[in-house]
From Swiss-Prot:
<keyword id="KW-1278">Translocase</keyword>
<keyword id="KW-0597">Phosphoprotein</keyword>
<keyword id="KW-0285">Flavoprotein</keyword>
<dbReference type="InterPro" id="IPR010204">
    <property type="entry name" value="NqrC"/>
</dbReference>
<keyword id="KW-0288">FMN</keyword>
<dbReference type="GO" id="GO:0006814">
    <property type="term" value="P:sodium ion transport"/>
</dbReference>
<keyword id="KW-0739">Sodium transport</keyword>
<protein>
    <recommendedName>
        <fullName>Na(+)-translocating NADH-quinone reductase subunit C</fullName>
        <ecNumber>7.2.1.1</ecNumber>
    </recommendedName>
</protein>
<dbReference type="GO" id="GO:0010181">
    <property type="term" value="F:FMN binding"/>
</dbReference>
<dbReference type="InterPro" id="IPR007329">
    <property type="entry name" value="FMN-bd"/>
</dbReference>
<keyword id="KW-0830">Ubiquinone</keyword>
<feature type="modified residue" description="FMN phosphoryl threonine">
    <location>
        <position position="223"/>
    </location>
</feature>
<keyword id="KW-0915">Sodium</keyword>
<keyword id="KW-0997">Cell inner membrane</keyword>
<dbReference type="Pfam" id="PF04205">
    <property type="entry name" value="FMN_bind"/>
</dbReference>
<keyword id="KW-0813">Transport</keyword>
<keyword id="KW-0812">Transmembrane</keyword>
Length: 255
């Protein structure tokens, strides 16, 4: 009997310790997920501040973001601003929800993203009461990964003022050079559209002609990643992406 009692006590201790450990692990996992989400938000805000050309040295990114950046929701079909909480809207999640997105046909899907949310986010860069730039979030498939970037556009709705990739899994030293500041700098001053308002950015294998309004050099040794960048611009500047919104910007829609 004493032996049975001892076994029961031992089992009770083991079960109790297991429960305590599982609670600790679960709590730690939840805390870690929350921290990871917070870090992801901070990183995204930092990239938006960077591509907007705002000096963040010695300053807190969340405070700068709140001061200078205004997220707004845009209806892709019409290009109009729509009501909603742009600060908490998750466009990736919405794209996976059939009620909030559309499945793209092969003909529509230049960027190989499969689905597109019905509503997108743009970030307006504020200078006092005026808007100085627009930040467009874009993404498209590369060789190995989906590549996510922010493109800064002047208020003419046509001139690029910057681009930064904030999430990608391309080959380091090859396709991964989409993050290289020297390569990204080529986009500054380029025109997104031609005189007929058609998407005109060209990623040129072997190098863009000197003085080209629309061309940037392709990535050396990374043709498929370069193609992915090209297709990303083709899609998001087109009618299925931010094309209708940018057309309204060019017509003075921000005023």
């Amino acid at each position: 009997m004493a032996s049975n009692d001892s076994i029961k006590k031992t089992l009770g201790v083991v079960v109790g310790l297991s429960l305590v450990c599982s609670i600790i692990v679960s709590t730690a996992a939840v805390g870690l997920r929350d921290q990871q989400k917070a870090n992801a938000v901070l990183d995204k805000q930092s990239k938006i501040i960077e591509v907007a050309g705002i000096d963040s040295k010695g300053k807190k990114v969340p405070e700068l973001f709140a001061q200078y950046i205004e997220p707004r929701l845009v209806d892709f079909a019409t290009g109009d601003f729509v009501d909603g909480n742009a600060a908490t809207y998750d466009q990736r999640k919405a794209a996976k929800d059939p009620a909030q997105s559309i499945k793209l046909t092969a003909e529509q899907d230049d960027a190989k993203i499969l689905r597109r949310a019905n509503t997108g986010v743009v970030y307006l860069v504020k200078n006092g009461d005026s808007i100085s730039k627009i930040i467009l979030p874009v993404h498209g498939n590369g060789l190995w990964s989906m590549m996510y970037a922010f493109v800064a556009v002047e208020t003419d709705g046509n001139t690029v003022s910057g681009i930064t990739y904030y999430e990608q899994g391309e080959t380091p030293g090859l396709g991964g050079e989409v993050e290289n500041p020297s390569w990204r700098a080529q986009f500054v001053g380029k025109k997104l559209f031609d005189e007929n308002h058609k998407p005109a950015i060209k990623v040129v294998k072997g190098g863009a002609p000197v003085g080209s309004e629309h061309g940037v050099d392709g990535l050396s040794g990374a043709t498929l990643t370069s193609n992915g960048v090209q297709h990303t611009f083709d899609f998001w500047l087109g009618d299925m992406g931010f094309g209708p919104f940018l057309a309204k910007v060019r017509d003075g829609g921000l005023n």
